[in-house]
Amino acid sequence: MHKIMAINAGSSSLKFQIFTMPGEEVLVKGLIERIGLPDAIFNMSFQNEKIKETRAINNHGEAVEILLEQLKTHQVINDLNEITGVGHRVAHGGEAFVSSCIVTDDVVKGIEDVTSLAPLHNPANIIGIKTFRELLPNAVSVAVFDTAFHQTIPEENFLYALPYELYEKHHIRKYGFHGTSHKYVAGKAAEVLKKPLEKLKIISCHLGNGASVCAIEAGKSVNTSMGFTPNAGLMMGTRSGTIDATIIPYLVDELGYSLDEVTHMMSSESGVLGVSGISSDFRDIEIAANEGNSRALLTLRMFTGQICNYIGAYASAMNGCDALLFTAGVGENSPLIRKMVTEQLSYLGVTCNVTKNNAGDMIISNDDEAVKVCIIPTNEELMIARDVEKYTKQTIS
């Protein structure tokens, strides 16, 4: 038995879990928020204890040092060498990384080379990797890429209709994201439905502040809604999703915006927040919609309509759908969103049992339906730990 840590470093946060492997038992989990501010928050829970502290944490390096200190102080671990592997979620691996890999200096450089494709995510991922490599030099560091699962998407689905040399020379193409989540829930759905993953056509809806839909056939991603960057596809909490590309030069040339302002607008001021004018959080939108707010209602119709457009397209492309999955914060916790989506898919044979949906059952379709509609809680940290486990076994052997 050994201990593996899964790390998800955000721009101002650090999410962590330690698993005992191979049993996959969660030893400790937590979240460090508001990194860089004087009132950063350290949360950690283990056994029956919960710790919450507010303190100044200036950067990710400090956050990691404090985390390792706290693990020893509370005797979650006695020696840092007990941690045999650390897995890092990395948002964008470009075409260079088709699977998870052991981190080397060359791997770090490769991640740095594609930072411009995920400017909000990759820099924090890199800081996390460098800090843990320095402080836990004996642990195997593994990079697990959000884009890797989508490397099986065929060329006709990942190419943009731009001059082909832009792909050949500059690798401009659809990459897709949330791959670790889509891969996990597809495998879990096969377990729940008691069917081989290789025999299933699955459409997975990862709906959170970031959102994407993925077509999965025989366990492999064949298409997904996000694109060259995580800004494409569905409207999201603050991201516009896919828009007519010529809107951008129009905003710059005709309305006087700078390119930086447009980029900020599309990533931080658009989507659910931009349309509703209320919030980027669907809980707030649902409350406002229930009170009759017209723009909140419009936001819900737009979001669920876009999801259904992708589901319809992917079901057509795969010539069917055996399972429709809802996961992530909104997908797992919003009966209203699930209801609004499934109501528009009756032509596919999709149903949503009201009682099961409101109760949050794992299978919410009627028992006799061919298309199974499931709520599958995602567990990206466990997928990361499993990938690390493979490499620690190889290293030890």
UniProtKB/Swiss-Prot annotation:
It comes from the Bacteria. Its EC number is 2.7.2.1. GO terms for biological process: acetate metabolic process; acetyl-CoA biosynthetic process. It is an enzyme of class 2 (transferase). Its main location: cytoplasm. It is found in: Cytoplasm. GO terms for molecular function: acetate kinase activity; ATP binding; magnesium ion binding. Gene3D superfamilies: 3.30.420.40. This is Acetate kinase 2. Substrate binds at R89. GO terms for cellular component: cytoplasm. Homodimer. Keywords: ATP-binding, Cytoplasm, Kinase, Magnesium, Metal-binding, Nucleotide-binding, Transferase. Pathway: Metabolic intermediate biosynthesis; acetyl-CoA biosynthesis; acetyl-CoA from acetate: step 1/2. Mg(2+) binds at N8, E380. Pfam families: Acetate_kinase. The record marks H178, R239 as: Transition state stabilizer. Its cofactor is Mg(2+); Mn(2+).
